[in-house]
Amino acid sequence: MRLFVGLGNPGARYAANRHNIGFMALDAVARRHRAAPWRRKFQGEASEAVIGTERVLLLKPETYMNESGRAVAEAQRFYKIALDDVVVFHDELDLAPAKVRVKKGGGNAGHNGLRSITAQCGNEYWRVRLGIGHPGDKALVHAYVLNDFAKAERPWVDDLCDALADHAALLAAGEDANFQNRIHLALQGRGWDDVKRVGDKQA
């Protein structure tokens, strides 16, 4: 079994925030792969799906971002899931909008959800880094991630979540490089390879 974790904050107030793109991604995967109904478990919402040929537990921690690791650790212990089989979808300030990178281990880049998971579970889990861009000034970061995606951003967010769901079987099978490439090609095909189109002024 693999564990797919989406990071975000619970409740309607945060649902459309940039910080919640991990929840959005996991919801898209659950819909596409006809996952079981969400239920309250492991200090969050949990579901199960067969993605490709793999049985996958889907988890959205409801502990708030800073305590996400408690939910992940509980689910990991219950099912005896190896850390190498844990995949975390999260927002990434250091990537341009609509860019996706997959990596194992590494630093937390100031992300409190990752920091909590690392503290509770260890560092060698997989990250699916979902680019949301940077506001350009460190002082603006808190407000930026806790604000909703702008109306003009929603098309790329929807296309990104669709692409993640379309190719989730590759990720479940451990084909991380192939998964990342397929996402890139899918978004390129929709025109999102031009960062200026999605408002990224850093590139």
Swiss-Prot record:
TRNA binds at residues 14, 64, 66, 112. The keyword tRNA-binding applies. Its main location: cytoplasm. InterPro entries: Pept_tRNA_hydro, Pept_tRNA_hydro_CS, Pept_tRNA_hydro_sf. The active site is at 19 (proton acceptor). GO terms for cellular component: cytoplasm. GO terms for molecular function: peptidyl-tRNA hydrolase activity; tRNA binding. Gene3D superfamilies: Peptidyl-tRNA hydrolase. It holds the Pfam family Pept_tRNA_hydro. It comes from the Bacteria. Hydrolyzes ribosome-free peptidyl-tRNAs (with 1 or more amino acids incorporated), which drop off the ribosome during protein synthesis, or as a result of ribosome stalling. Catalyzes the release of premature peptidyl moieties from peptidyl-tRNA molecules trapped in stalled 50S ribosomal subunits, and thus maintains levels of free tRNAs and 50S ribosomes. Monomer. PANTHER family: PEPTIDYL-TRNA HYDROLASE (PTHR17224:SF1). This is Peptidyl-tRNA hydrolase. It comes from Methylobacterium sp. (strain 4-46).
